[in-house]
């Protein structure tokens, strides 16, 4: 009996001890939660009763060289609902469906969805948002937002680019300068009770957004409009596939004009141009067409430059001393290179001519001879030294690189064709940049649009700087090249670019596209003025013109007209 009582007493003590330990553990846990972790759980409790809504920042403007706004903001609204606060769901559904022009079932699903906040529609016109706000519907929020707006429509569309639904840059300058333009979003914090209803007495906590900075660019609206009209005119007259025009300062790299027609409407960038047939196309095929429409051929696409590239061969030959302006050549209408007969554009030949006359006549055999005198290794040396194997660094996304033979794969035939601008490909911006360095005394500048960054209120700003590489060629060679190219315009194949009272230099080009048997051409002209001290360099490239296709006949007059427009504005 005594043993049994002792056994029960032990069991009681064990139960008591276990309970005491459990109680002690609970007390310890409570102390830990209320003391050590109190801040953490206070924050969690706050989060349960706080609702956050983002306030988008006003995106920075993009302005042209004279301060005219090219990309601006338009006030729009975002319509949202808070399920727990809606008192009359059917009324909310009916009004939102009506005012937003949305399907009733779509709105119903969003309104009846149990979530802290549900977005109904974004980018709603402010006038519509004001009407909805006027209904004073419980649980319906109307927040003002921003949508990108482009006052000039399609002007410089492939340069400026556009933003998506979230107002972030997608292509062009909009994406290149995203970090500068986007600003910093703000937020609104509201406190709710356990049912999720906002507590009016506590109001709301607001953190204001910070507007993005403004970007000033070198592009000139007047010149861009003039050049775009000139490009459209020649595209229509020659029934060409597309036309590109580039105008820049060869001394500092500022780009004044960058036209690529057909352009597209920046305010409706996801709609293909009217002349594009989309019947029978699936969504991926339509997207591919959009991607093609958005491309900027001046820097995203490469082409065979043809005879405009003779400027590079000329400069390399003069710098290396393998040719002089007084050297004489004979052109029978072709040049034999190894076992290949390479023809001149003039099949009957130019006969005896000086190097300068060879440039005026755009004679292929003359430049083949200069290339052969240089040799593969030396020609490749200058090709690389002039910067043709690297990208220009232009401040737009997606710049394509040069497509060139590897030096070890180049023979005399490849060298001969490269010397007059065929069998390899570069971008128009690369050609313009390289020729600029050969005309300005040997400084390889960086082509660019961005000039300065300005604060949103215009009270402060900073100038953008770009790298410059010196010693590309000597000043003496540069001066000689300028003189030869002035003769090309005043007395040679570029005579259609002559301007009374102003010295113009330049080079024509007419190159066949692949396959050669298709008889399709790229006609172009590169010009600069004044010839003795170039301040403007321009290129016009016409793809697949019909009828007369010579660059000196159809592209040179376009640059002439644009140069005259520049002179009128000086």
Question: Can you say where each PLM-predicted feature lies in the sequence?
Answer:
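Periplasmic/cell-envelope proteins involved in peptidoglycan metabolism and beta-lactam response
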Residues: 1-278, 302, 377-389, 497-500, ...
